[in-house]
């Protein structure tokens, strides 16, 4: 029952189906679990698809059928790959940079994911340290029902700060919006 209460996401930088299978095996061993909840292709230069020559998506589908992964996701920094992944309908999550400094194109990605019932994992929610007000960053992300921010926590105090927002979430006030 403990494992069922925990959601595990990891990624592979593999370039081939065989590489993905090796990475997945290693991840399952290292994490000491039987399955991964979200297994993501990490920042590929293209959008992996069934039947393409990389074999990545086919290997992920096979692992999903075997019960080794539950959801297939993709991480990316390239807008065109992110758009293609959303439009393909093949992915259950997109991990992409997103913070309150987001551009209109970033906001369009969030909306496109929402329309496709696709989760949006916001990486770099503090913009690599450029944003220092975590309450504002949290309040911004909370405005979007399909956005889950991941925080680059480096100290226990930062973890405590973000955990406190679960019980007492900051809201987007005029004061925070002005930051």
Task: Please state what every model-predicted region is.
Residues 10, 46, 72, 148-149:
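Short, flexible active-site loop motifs that bind/organize anionic cofactors or intermediates
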Residues 88, 105-179:
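Structured C-terminal cap/extension of enzyme domains
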Residues 1-6:
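N-terminal binding-site loop/beta-alpha segment at the start of enzyme catalytic domains
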Residues 9-10, 95:
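Short internal beta-strands
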